[in-house]
């Protein structure tokens, strides 16, 4: 994994979501070229994977807490 990819994975969920919203706005602009749209799409794909990872971590933590409560 590249250094850039490692740094990207440390992006907080909220920051990734904000950037995704920015990308959507940019892609909806008629002045955005096809090549730029592709680059933005690739960035968005990576950000979505990061968001999914954050969500999976939170779901796992919630399940763990729920299981602990059930055992009590």
Swiss-Prot record:
Q: Which SUPFAM superfamilies match?
A: XseB-like
**Entry's Gene Ontology BP terms:** DNA catabolic process
Judged by the first EC level, this protein's enzyme class is hydrolase
Q: Which Pfam families match?
A: Exonuc_VII_S
What are the subcellular locations of this protein?
Cytoplasm
- Reaction(s) catalysed (UniProt annotation): Exonucleolytic cleavage in either 5'- to 3'- or 3'- to 5'-direction to yield nucleoside 5'-phosphates
Q: Which GO terms describe its cellular component?
A: cytosol; exodeoxyribonuclease VII complex
List UniProt keywords, sorted A-Z.
Cytoplasm, Exonuclease, Hydrolase, Nuclease
Identify the EC number(s). Answer: 3.1.11.6
Which molecular-function annotations from GO does this UniProt entry contain?
A: exodeoxyribonuclease VII activity
User: Gene3D superfamilies, per this entry?
Assistant: Exonuclease VII, small subunit (1.10.287.1040)
Q: Which family does it belong to?
A: Belongs to the XseB family.
Q: Quaternary structure? A: Heterooligomer composed of large and small subunits.
Biological role = Bidirectionally degrades single-stranded DNA into large acid-insoluble oligonucleotides, which are then degraded further into small acid-soluble oligonucleotides.
Q: State what protein this is by name.
A: Exodeoxyribonuclease 7 small subunit
What is the source species?
A: Chlamydia trachomatis serovar A (strain ATCC VR-571B / DSM 19440 / HAR-13)
């Amino acid at each position: 994994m590249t250094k850039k990819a490692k740094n990207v994975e440390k992006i907080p969920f909220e920051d990734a979501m904000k950037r995704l919203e920015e990308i959507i706005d940019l892609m909806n602009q008629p002045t955005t070229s096809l090549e730029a749209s592709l680059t933005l799409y690739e960035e968005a794909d990576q950000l979505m994977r990061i968001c999914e990872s954050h969500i999976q971590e939170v779901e796992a933590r919630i399940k763990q807490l729920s299981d602990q409560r059930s055992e009590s």
